[in-house]
Structure formats: C-alpha cells, structure tokens
Amino acid sequence: MAGHSKWANIKHRKGAQDAKRGKIFTRLIKEITVSARMGGGDAATNPRLRSAITAARAQNLPKDTMDKAIKRGTGELEGVNYEEVRFEGYGPGGVAIIVDCLTDNNNRTVADVRHIFNKYGGNMGTHGCVAFMFDKKGQIMFDAEGINEDAIIEAALEAGAEDVVHEGDSFEVLTDPNDFSDVLEALATAGFATPSEAEVVMRPQNLQQLDEQQASTMLKLYEKLEENEDVQNIYANFDISDEIMETLSA
C-alpha cells in the first residue's frame, strides 16, 4: 500500500516551518471557532468541529484555548465573525491551486490573494476551475524516524485508513474524511500517538512537475500566500525534484 507523495513531503516540511512561526495555532483556533459557529459546540454531533479538535490536539493546542475558541463560535464569548472564502487558480507551469481563507474583510482578502497570484506568475480562476483535480482526504503525517513501516501500515489499515504513503522522511496516512478522527484515535491506541500533522485536506490527484525557474516562482507564491493572515490552507498539485529542491535551498 506504500507509494510516493512528493507534494505531501514538501508540505510536511513547510508545515514544520509554519509551526515554528506560530501561525498554525492561529489557523487551528479560527477553524474551531467557525466550526462551532456553523454546527454547534458539541463535537459529538458536529463532525467538522470534531475534526478540528482532533487536528488541534495533534498539534498540542491547549484545551483551555480550544474551549474558548468553541465558546467564541457559539456566542458564549465575544469574538470576530469570520467568513469562509475559497479561491482557485493557477500558478507557474499550470499548477492548480486552492486557497481556503477565513476573513473578517472579504474585499481585503480578495485583493490580497489576487495580488499574490498576479505578482508570482499565477492567475485567479473561477470557482470550481481546479477543485475537481483534488480529493478531500483525512491526512495524518508522522516523522519516519524510529517507525517500522510494516507496523504503521498494518496499524493504519486495521484502523480503517485507505492508504499509507512513505515519502522521504515521513509517513502519510490517508483516510476517508468521515473516518479521520476514528483512525487517528485508533493509531494512538496502537502506539502511534505523536503525528507531526493531522487534518482533513484537499489532496491532489496528480502532480505537475516543475523546472527550476517554475519551482522557484511557485515556492515564492506559496510562501506569500502562507504569510497572509487570512489564509487557512493552501493546496497545490506541484512536484519538485530532489535535485531542484537542493539547488533552490543552497
């Protein structure tokens, strides 16, 4: 069942950098708040909130912080009213990009995201123009060091996962979105309790290989989107060879 997912590995490394900047906590808090606002504060009856809490626990977000985020969503505490916005478009080399945002000022966010696309060789498209190139999946990432491949594959499949992908220094466990929380909990029970990342994502069906120039520009576009305070998640279907990544990292 093991395969390869270069994009997941790139995203995994970038996710580690993101965590160091602390943005990931802000992103998780906003998702919990919006989930509670849309579906209520009971995770047992609100699947989106349950997934958000599961992802937050995987990143060690304090329980008190989660509880306050839920209360802001249900109106028990005062908070910002965020609107969900999804942008779709293309980057260098025809890369398909989805950008999910939570914003308190839609006009500002539209202008900011469009500016980033235009500045770094991309262009915004219409709703639905690239979403069909992605599948919604639960994604649980583990650092590969110290993990037996056969053991994690067996545990994941027994837990109800769809696939396990080994790429570089990480394992990626894929699930149906509805099974995400159950699989994560079952993996923890089986001894795999410390994922580096766990969330429901839009996973590309195929990857677009980029040359060095395209890769350089695409990574700049990605990083600028990532730095925007309204951006929650970025999904893209690009692939960069190890050789080009080494050159760009030098």
From Swiss-Prot:
<keyword id="KW-0805">Transcription regulation</keyword>
<keyword id="KW-0963">Cytoplasm</keyword>
<dbReference type="InterPro" id="IPR017856">
    <property type="entry name" value="Integrase-like_N"/>
</dbReference>
<dbReference type="GO" id="GO:0005829">
    <property type="term" value="C:cytosol"/>
</dbReference>
<keyword id="KW-0804">Transcription</keyword>
<dbReference type="InterPro" id="IPR029072">
    <property type="entry name" value="YebC-like"/>
</dbReference>
<dbReference type="Pfam" id="PF01709">
    <property type="entry name" value="Transcrip_reg"/>
</dbReference>
<dbReference type="GO" id="GO:0003677">
    <property type="term" value="F:DNA binding"/>
</dbReference>
<dbReference type="InterPro" id="IPR002876">
    <property type="entry name" value="Transcrip_reg_TACO1-like"/>
</dbReference>
<keyword id="KW-0238">DNA-binding</keyword>
<protein>
    <recommendedName>
        <fullName>Probable transcriptional regulatory protein Mmc1_0479</fullName>
    </recommendedName>
</protein>
<dbReference type="Pfam" id="PF20772">
    <property type="entry name" value="TACO1_YebC_N"/>
</dbReference>
<dbReference type="InterPro" id="IPR026564">
    <property type="entry name" value="Transcrip_reg_TACO1-like_dom3"/>
</dbReference>
<dbReference type="GO" id="GO:0006355">
    <property type="term" value="P:regulation of DNA-templated transcription"/>
</dbReference>
<comment type="similarity">
    <text>Belongs to the TACO1 family.</text>
</comment>
<dbReference type="InterPro" id="IPR048300">
    <property type="entry name" value="TACO1_YebC-like_2nd/3rd_dom"/>
</dbReference>
<dbReference type="InterPro" id="IPR049083">
    <property type="entry name" value="TACO1_YebC_N"/>
</dbReference>
